[in-house]
Curated annotation (Swiss-Prot):
Residue stretches making up the HTH tetR-type domain: 5-65
DNA-binding region: 28-47
One of the Pfam families matching this protein, by short name: TetR_N
Keywords, in A-Z order: DNA-binding, Repressor, Transcription, Transcription regulation
Species the sequence originates in: Bacillus subtilis (strain 168)
UniProt-recorded name of the protein: Uncharacterized HTH-type transcriptional regulator YxaF
Lineage top rank: taxon: Bacteria
Length: 191
């Protein structure tokens, strides 16, 4: 028998994946329950406020995973240019096999719901800012002033999000690789 925690985790994981692939409006609660294998009543037990509550938790869940992946790349090199390029190249590698593309972590849901759901817009904004902060911390550790590092963090994340959108649309990682190539121009070394 599936434990309550397992059912919640399955629902959350499945919802996160489907929102990334299909977006908010194309993902139905019945599909989430069916694909998660969780008991039907468990969705409303764990997410009594329905789809919006589930989407908010799914964005938070996905956001933490991506933040961890960014931090891993930042930890792999002391050079911020190399670390940022590494993360972008790892992200680009998802597009090596177009049949296994996982979708857009938060961008699709954010663009689809920002004007209709303030709670979803807010959680997406917080997730984006958490990713930007990882880049900014790396830059500050390497001599960048806080304001400049924060601006660059936002710019880098914006470029990556746009690169993911273009790579997904083109089924080709070239846009992300072009961004990685331009990071040295954008992030001029201090010292």
């Amino acid at each position: 028998m599936t434990s309550r925690g397992d059912s919640r985790e399955k629902i959350l994981h499945t919802a996160s994946r489907l929102f990334q692939l299909q977006g908010y409006h194309a993902t139905g609660l019945n599909q989430i329950v069916k694909e998660s294998g969780a008991p039907k009543g468990s969705l409303y037990h764990f997410f009594p406020n329905g789809k919006e509550e589930l989407a908010i938790e799914a964005v938070t869940y996905t956001g933490k995973i991506v933040e961890h992946l960014i931090q891993q790349s930042m930890d792999e090199s002391s050079d911020p240019v190399e670390a940022i390029q590494l993360f972008i190249k790892k992200t680009a590698s998802q597009f090596d096999n177009t049949e296994s593309i996982k979708g857009i972590p938060v961008g699709l849901l954010a663009s689809e719901t920002a004007l209709i759901s303030e709670p979803l817009r807010t959680v997406c904004m917080k997730v984006f800012k958490s990713w930007e902060a990882v880049f900014a911390r790396k830059l500050m550790e390497n001599g960048f002033a806080e304001e400049e590092a924060n601006q660059l963090g936002t710019l880098i994340n914006s470029m990556i999000e746009g690169g993911i959108m273009l790579s997904l649309t083109n089924k080709d990682k070239t846009p992300l690789l072009l961004i990685a190539e331009q990071i040295p121009v954008l992030v001029r070394k201090k010292g």
